Amino acid sequence: MASTASIRLLTSFVGAASLLGSATCSSSGAHDVANAAPTGKNIGVNVSTINTWDGSRPFMNLIYGSSWQSRDPSGAGRDVEVSQLDSAGWVKSLPAGYQATRTLYGVADADVICRWQGNDHGSMRVVVNESEVRQTRMRGANELRFRYSLRSPHDPPLPSIRYTVDPADYVRNLDCREADAKPGVLFDPTFLRTIDGFSVIRFMKWQAAVEANTAVNWAGRNTPSSGDYLGKDGVPVELMVSLANEVGADPWFAMPWNADDDYVARFARYVRDNLAPGRRVYVEVSNEVWNGSYAVMRQAQREGVAEGLDNSDGEYGQAMARYAEKTRQVMGIWSKVFDGQSDRLVRVASAQNVSPFWSERILAHGDTAASIDALATAPYWELGDDEARGKSLDDIMSHSLPAKIAETLDWAKKQKAVAAKYGKRYIAYEGGQHVWLNNNQPLVAQIERDPRMYNLYKSYIGRWNRDIGDTMALFALTGGIGKAGFGLVEYAGQPVSEAPKMRAVRESFAQSRR
C-alpha cells in the first residue's frame, strides 16, 4: 500500500519518461461505471496488520495480537529484549522485580481461560487500566479464568496478563481463549465469517519481514508454537496455508527480500505439500519495490548500483533492474519446487499502476517475462488533501471519486496491454479507495461511511471485471478510520448494513454464483 504522498513522490522521482510511455488518461466515462454488472469471482482481499486495535482478531488464542513487554517495579513498561526470549519467543528471564506482560485481544462479554506450561509461582494476573479484573485461579493447575467485556471493537482499555518469570521453568505455550472454545481451534469464527467468500487472500501484512525488510532464515522463523507472531517473519506459513484451506481461497505470499534461498525453497515446499488440491498459490518478491517510501526500494537501488546494472534510466532504473533480477532468482526457486505442478503456481511481478513504462522495463529486463505468469499493480482511486480542499462531501462522492475510478482503471487497461504484449495475465495486488486526508479526519469518516460508497465499489468492481476480468485483491479486510480508512469493514463481524464497501463486495459474490 502506498500513501498519497509516496505515490506523488515516486511519480515525480521516476520522471516524465514513465508517463510518456502511455497516452494521457481520460476521465471520460466517470459516471458510466455503474452500468457495468459486477461479479465477485475475481475478488480477493488483503489481510490487515496483526494488532489488538484494528478491529480484527484472526486467532482464537488472544495473545497473538501483541508482543511481549516487561514492567519494572515502578510500573514503567518497555519492550522485552531479544536476549530475554528463548528461541521460540517465550520470555525466559527478566531482571529482579520485573514482570512479563502481554496485551490480549478484547472479547465481547465472555469468560476467558488462560492455560500455560511452566511455573509462574502463583503470580499470573489479568489487569485492565491497572486494576485487576475478577479472576479465579484453579487450584493445583496452570489455569486462570476471568470475565471481560469489550464495550465496542475500538474501545480500550484492553486486558493485559502479567506474571513473574522463573528462569528455571518459565511460562510457555500460554493460551487464552473463551472458556467455551475448543482448545485446538486456530481461527476466530467471526474472522472466518468476515473473510469467507474471497477468491484470493494476500498475506503480505502478516509477513512481518516483508515491510520490515529484515533478514530471515528457516531455522529462525516463527512456528505455530512460537510466543509471538509479530516479529521475525510474522505469522507462520502453517497458519496462513491452514486459513486458505479452511475458507477455500488461493493464498498470495510475498517473499522477504532478505530471505535466504533455503527459506524460500522450504516455504515453497511447505505450500506445495500442504495447500489443498485444486488451490493455486500466488507469489511475489517483497512489496512495492517500486515505492521509494520503503526500505526495500532503497536496498534494491544500492544493490543495482553496486552491481553496475544498466543506468540509462538513472539509479531508479538500476533499482528496477535489480528487482527484475531478484524476481527471476526467487521465481526460479519456486518453479523448481513446483516442477510438474506449474498449474498450481502464479508467479507475479509488481509495478506502479500509473507507470506502464516501468512495467515494460521490468518485464523486458533479461528473461524476466519468461520467469513470471502475471503482472500486478494497485489500481487505487485516491483522494488527498489537495483534491479534497474546498469540496463538499457531495462533490467528492458524486464527482471526484467517480472520476478517480475512471482514471485509475484507464491506467489499468494500459497495464493490461503491457502484460498482454508478453503473454501474461494482468492482476491487482491491492485496490479500492485510497482516501488519505492528513488534516480532516472527520471528513474521512464521512466519506468512508457514506452510503454512496456502496455504489462506488459496485461500479469499481463492475468495471474491473468488464475491462480487466482477472484477479484483484482489495485492500484491506478490516481497519478503523483515521487519516485513512482502508477496511472493507471497520471490525470483523461488523453488520454489512453498516459497511457500504463490504455490502457491495458481498453482493458481487452473490451475483457471481447466479
Predicted regions and their residues:
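Bacterial N-terminal signal peptides that target proteins for export
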Residues: 1-13
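Non-catalytic accessory regions flanking glycosidase/transglycosidase catalytic cores in CAZymes
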Residues: 25-285, 290-399, 405, 409-435, ...
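Bacterial N-terminal signal peptides
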Residues: 11-22
